[in-house]
């Protein structure tokens, strides 16, 4: 009977393994509550060996959150195919897939904390927000956004973050409802801005022109009209 020989990992392969193990642990508990000993045990190596690949706890956490940030930023990439509302809903579905699968890690990434409060980690969060901003503009077909559109998009990204964090705290509102609501929120923010600025009005009209009569943005307009008091 032969005994299998454990293959020795290369440096980069081992680093990637440790990052993956850390992210898996972060999906269940905050990075602040995960120790290097736990990461080492889950990876099947000794604590000193972890420090051979990462100089300290913070450097491992930052590497893990870098991968998570790259993953999250990628969730906003969407082909320009189909109505704008439907495309945005697909993006929100992938966004909440990430939030659902990396709850404590997502919360730590967005809120910061002792383990993840460095300037490097803050820069990671900013990079995710910027990637989301660029992708939304691409969906709108705009490369040089006017100031009011930038305000709308960045405000909406902040709203999506806050909504996800609140949802994680008890999940008291159905996820599918929030995904749809965030699409409507984007349309509402754009509509309010369009009501006060002609340049935004042109952009909003162009978006609505690509929406079918039963699309998500049209649905919001119908719901708002239904809320208006009926004239006697």
Descriptions of predicted regions:
Residues 63, 77-104, 142-146, 179:
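Hydrophobic alpha-helical connector segments
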Residues 1-2, 134-138, 169-232:
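C-terminal peripheral helix-coil segments that are non-catalytic and often amphipathic
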Residues 98-122, 133-137, 161-169, 199:
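Amphipathic alpha-helical segments used for helix-helix packing
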Residues 117-143, 149-162, 176-191:
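Amphipathic alpha-helical packing segments from all-alpha helical-bundle domains
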């Amino acid at each position: 009977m032969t005994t299998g020989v454990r293959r020795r990992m290369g440096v980069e392969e081992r680093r990637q393994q440790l990052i993956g193990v850390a992210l898996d642990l972060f999906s269940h508990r905050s990075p602040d509550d995960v120790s290097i000993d736990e990461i080492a045990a889950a990876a099947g190596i000794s604590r000193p060996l972890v420090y051979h690949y990462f100089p300290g706890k913070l450097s491992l956490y930052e590497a893990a959150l870098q991968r998570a940030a790259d993953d999250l930023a990628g969730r906003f990439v969407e082909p320009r195919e189909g109505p704008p509302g439907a495309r945005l809903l697909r993006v929100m579905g992938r966004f909440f897939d990430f939030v659902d699968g990396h709850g404590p890690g997502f919360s730590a990434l967005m809120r910061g904390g002792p383990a993840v409060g460095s300037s490097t980690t803050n820069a990671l969060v900013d990079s995710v927000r910027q990637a989301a901003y660029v992708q939304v503009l691409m969906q709108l077909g705009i490369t040089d956004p006017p100031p009011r559109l930038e305000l709308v998009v960045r405000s909406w990204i902040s709203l999506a973050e806050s909504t996800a964090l609140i949802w994680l705290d008890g999940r008291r509102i159905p996820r599918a409802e929030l995904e749809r609501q965030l699409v409507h929120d984007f349309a509402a923010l754009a509509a309010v801005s369009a009501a006060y600025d002609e340049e935004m009005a042109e952009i909003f009209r162009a978006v609505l022109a690509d929406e079918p009569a039963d699309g998500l943005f049209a649905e919001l307009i119908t719901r708002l009209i239904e809320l208006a008091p009926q004239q006697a």
